[in-house]
């Protein structure tokens, strides 16, 4: 079975699921947890507290265990959880890191032997037969890339958890010589807002409060706290655009497609900005995973032909 996983610093996304990139480890099975994975004699549950940012996600087993959760969720979505399954895995990396980390990322997931674990007390054995690695951002627009061919130059801007990744398309084809990554994602903004709200309003808030305010959801936060959150988010969006201009990414003369959860949060500010002449948005936060799946399906079809 082919399964696509987008390993974000803030969230893990598959074609049908997304969850925070957070783990809690337990020496015994936690009695109240409704989703438990047992691997190598340890018990793991998903946590709302995301892992610290890491450029290289292969340095320990954390993202492999998160991937086991993702695989189990997708297998459960497809039907009754099988006792054994052969897996082809489609994953991605930021364009700027793609050339450097692609082989290492592939080797991290492709195990020579079967992997045994239990998901919600159901034993499973999987064999990851192959791993396909693709550039983020480009994957998100892969299903509609034919519609972008008429643009001589177009920037893909993926505002994610920790980074903002930029890729230039020339007549619909990625220019891998022009890919940039800025450490200006949603996590950096949230950390700044949490500090600011604490200093100005003597109140402790979390990432979920910020997301709810920016998405227009109901909260019990005071009006002045909401105002601080909105103004801070607008400033962060402006800072991203200013930094892009320093990298010679001028969105007054080139159209842009904005991707990622951050783009959804900042959409109102980006559309109103005089620094952006023409913008479209891919609002599905699972878009990269959907793109990985589509590209891997095409690659597998060629291999099997």
Task: Please report, for each region that a protein language model flagged, where it lies by residue.
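Nucleotide/phosphate-binding catalytic cleft detector across ATP-hydrolyzing
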Residues: 1-154, 173-188, 200, 207-305
């Amino acid at each position: 079975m082919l399964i696509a996983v987008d390993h974000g610093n803030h969230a893990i996304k598959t074609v049908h699921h997304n969850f925070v990139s957070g783990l809690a480890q337990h020496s015994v099975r936690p009695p109240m947890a409704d989703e438990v994975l047992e691997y190598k004699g340890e018990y793991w549950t998903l946590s709302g507290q995301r892992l610290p940012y890491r450029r290289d996600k292969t340095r320990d087993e954390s993202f492999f265990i998160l991937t086991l959760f993702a695989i189990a969720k997708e297998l459960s979505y497809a039907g009754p959880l099988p006792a054994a399954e052969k897996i082809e895995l489609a994953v991605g990396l930021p364009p700027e890191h793609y050339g450097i980390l692609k082989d290492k990322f592939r080797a991290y997931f492709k195990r020579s032997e079967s992997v045994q674990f239990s998901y919600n007390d159901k034993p499973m054995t999987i064999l990851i037969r192959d791993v396909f690695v693709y550039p983020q951002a480009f994957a998100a627009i892969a299903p509609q890339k034919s519609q972008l061919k008429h643009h001589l130059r177009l920037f893909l801007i993926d505002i994610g958890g920790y980074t903002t990744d930029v890729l230039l398309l020339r007549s619909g084809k990625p220019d891998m010589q022009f890919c940039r990554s800025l450490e200006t994602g949603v996590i950096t903004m949230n950390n700044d807002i949490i500090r600011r709200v604490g200093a100005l309003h003597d109140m402790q808030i979390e990432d979920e409060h910020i997301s709810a305010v920016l998405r227009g959801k109901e909260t019990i936060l005071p009006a002045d706290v909401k105002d601080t959150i909105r103004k801070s988010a607008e400033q962060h969006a402006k800072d991203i655009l200013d930094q892009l201009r320093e990298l010679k990414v001028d969105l007054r003369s080139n159209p842009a497609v904005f991707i990622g959860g951050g783009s959804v949060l900042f959409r109102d500010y980006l559309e109103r900005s005089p620094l952006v002449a023409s913008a479209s948005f891919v609002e599905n936060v699972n878009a990269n995973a959907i793109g990985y799946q589509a590209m891997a399906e095409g690659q597998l079809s060629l291999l099997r032909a």
